[in-house]
């Protein structure tokens, strides 16, 4: 008989054992709070270089006050799908604020970026369409693309020549990221917009990690690269990174949003985000738009870290954003380095396959405007000079 009362039909124990033996088993650590570039775990305080709170807004008093005010007015939860009674004036106001900020006709709110990305692809793409994706796109995009009836073609990371060879006129959707979440580099959006226009295909940006950090008033990667919003048919962004709250949105034409309201199953069949959360995000946007000084400070910290780490012999990815991949190579070496930093009171996450390709394990170091120069210096001191190959026990850089 296949399966049993003990093991079941799914091979859970074997799968977990295989992950553990490969040094890839994941687990969770409960924190006692994280804000302002700090983290408390098991009663100990750490410098936090692993969060996506790029502007340090997650603990901002004005956002917390707006959240509480929203709870007082609307309650703790939406209580229904947005197409029933879960859509409030607070949601509508946030959509209008986002549309004005980002230069799009209309916006639709989602509970998270994963569902927003998947909702768009599933609603738009049928068996007669083509989907082109950068090979380093987020798992939400890659996963949904592989499940759709359309044909998905992946092009090498930021390889516009390869994409141009793959394109067919008026057949579907090109998707790439503003800032790539594991490498910190930016998509080539001027070239992408030009190729989309020339081929008659639609273009979508996942700007989860660019929004709030890049461009005038934090408008994101398109603004930073001088790309008109109208040349990108679909914008997706999130509220849980630089904006310091949670949730996501899709922006574009009014017709696109009306279509998604009717055909995006992740939207139609989910309880809406709490109205109080929308109140908090609206307040956050106001702060982000005025945060030029914080963005300038963040840029200085990025430069300070990169210069210091390279002087110590560490290999970094080609990133000028808050995401700084410190490339280690083997998973075991990345875990050991992360543990050594924790012993020094510094928290930085080790990223291993399958999140990144085999042989490219890394510390994903993220900087925040809440950090100080002395915090970066303490991180560099904890890292110390990069060990030689022999000292690393055979580990190698990616």
UniProtKB/Swiss-Prot annotation:
Entry-linked InterPro entries: Aminotrans_II_pyridoxalP_BS (IPR001917), Aminotransferase_I/II_large (IPR004839), AON_synthase_class-II (IPR050087), AONS_Archaea/Proteobacteria (IPR004723), AONS_Proteobacteria (IPR022834), PyrdxlP-dep_Trfase (IPR015424), PyrdxlP-dep_Trfase_major (IPR015421), PyrdxlP-dep_Trfase_small (IPR015422)
E.C. number: 2.3.1.47
Sequence positions bearing N6-(pyridoxal phosphate)lysine: 241
Domain of life: Bacteria
GO BP, one annotated term: biotin biosynthetic process
Cofactor requirements of the protein: pyridoxal 5'-phosphate
Binding site for pyridoxal 5'-phosphate: 113-114, 181, 209, 238
Pfam families: Aminotran_1_2
Keywords: Biotin biosynthesis, Pyridoxal phosphate, Transferase
Known catalytic reactions: 6-carboxyhexanoyl-[ACP] + L-alanine + H(+) = (8S)-8-amino-7-oxononanoate + holo-[ACP] + CO2
Assembly mode: Homodimer.
Family designation: Belongs to the class-II pyridoxal-phosphate-dependent aminotransferase family. BioF subfamily.
Protein name: 8-amino-7-oxononanoate synthase
